[in-house]
């Protein structure tokens, strides 16, 4: 009934598919970011789901071939960066899958790419800024370290503090997901 009403309002099936898959993709991208912060991994099933969603959306708007070419080139270039040890494998797969979600026009793809780069740089600056703060918190003793805090969020914060203190890798899926979400939001909600 809802689909019939939406179609009666003049919204085409392609827009409805884009809207539905856009909402689903945004949820999966947010989950990828949170999972990367919590565990420093991006599950393969998540990248595969995003890849399938991207393929479905590109099929609906008749740009599957162009989307697959751009996602494939992205994967190959990022794979080379992974081989050099400069990026995690989960981030490579997530970025390639997210590239397929983004419409394959030059303007949108460039916005997505520079969004990832800029947000990744901002993430790096935040991590650099947090190092001195964490040193002061650690110097305050157990109370300063939130030793009494419980719950998932507190554990993630403690783990993140430990990673920052030891100069661990950045959760780059946050930058990839945020850029993809910022790119998809205006496109997904054009009902």
Where are the language model's segments positioned?
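A membrane-topology feature that recognizes alpha-helical transmembrane segments
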Residues: 1-191
């Amino acid at each position: 009934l809802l689909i019939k009403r939406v179609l009666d309002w003049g919204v085409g099936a392609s827009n409805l598919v884009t809207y539905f898959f856009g909402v689903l993709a945004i949820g999966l991208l947010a989950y990828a970011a949170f999972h990367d912060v919590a565990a420093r991994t991006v599950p393969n099933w998540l990248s595969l789901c995003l890849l399938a969603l991207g393929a479905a959306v590109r099929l609906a708007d008749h740009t599957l071939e162009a989307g697959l070419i751009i996602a494939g080139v992205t994967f190959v270039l990022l794979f080379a960066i992974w081989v050099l040890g400069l990026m995690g494998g989960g981030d490579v797969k997530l970025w390639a899958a997210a590239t397929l979600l983004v419409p394959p026009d030059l303007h949108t793809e460039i916005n997505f790419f520079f969004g990832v780069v800029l947000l990744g740089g901002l993430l790096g600056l935040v991590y650099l800024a947090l190092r001195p703060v964490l040193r002061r918190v650690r110097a305050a003793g157990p109370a300063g370290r939130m030793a009494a805090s419980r719950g998932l969020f507190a554990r993630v914060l403690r783990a993140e503090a430990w990673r920052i203190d030891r100069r661990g890798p950045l959760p780059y899926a946050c930058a990839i997901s945020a850029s993809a979400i910022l790119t998809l939001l205006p496109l997904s909600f054009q009902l």
